[in-house]
């Protein structure tokens, strides 16, 4: 009798544990290329070269798993002679229509920038996503004639979990 109860308890435990899914952490590394499509800059007359503003960047994001996304990033900046801080909201739209929205903060130093932040929203296969995003080094091309801001490229990392299905 005791063996039957033990066996029944074991079967029930296996069924319960088997039905419950656990969210697992995922990491997606990517490369990106962006360009400024809109820009507005305002000079602040407190010190030489101080400016604030925003720009909108569009670009392509290629992930190491073969996935590709189109990205739009709204960048708010405060810098003096090209060095300062930035706050960004980015939206990655994947080929299947799923999206990942991020909010990052960072620094810019003339020819390079870096940012870290969090994933704040997702749709489609990324519904319920939670996690972080990081671009350890964003590099800028030389400013070309007629450009208000240079094109950028770099690497990034998405670390995230999705809710159990």
State what each model feature region is.
Residues 9-18:
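Bacterial N-terminal signal peptides
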Residues 24-165:
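Beta-strand-enriched cores of mature, soluble protein domains
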Residues 1-10:
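Bacterial N-terminal signal peptides that target proteins for export
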């Amino acid at each position: 009798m005791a063996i039957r109860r033990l066996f029944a308890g074991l079967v029930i435990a296996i069924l319960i544990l088997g039905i419950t899914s656990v969210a697992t952490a995922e990491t997606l590394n990517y490369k990106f290329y962006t360009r400024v499509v809109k820009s507005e800059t305002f000079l602040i007359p407190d010190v030489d070269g101080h400016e604030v503003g925003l720009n909108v960047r569009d670009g392509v994001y290629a992930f190491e798993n073969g996935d590709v996304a189109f990205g739009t990033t709204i960048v708010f900046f405060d810098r003096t002679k090209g060095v300062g801080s930035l706050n960004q909201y980015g939206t990655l739209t994947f080929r299947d229509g799923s999206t990942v929205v991020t909010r990052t903060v960072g620094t810019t130093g003339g020819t390079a920038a870096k940012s870290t932040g969090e994933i704040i929203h997702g749709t489609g296969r990324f519904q319920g996503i939670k996690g972080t995003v990081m671009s350890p080094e964003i590099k800028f091309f030389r400013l070309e004639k007629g450009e208000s801001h240079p094109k950028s490229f770099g690497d990034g990392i998405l670390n995230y979990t999705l809710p159990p299905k």
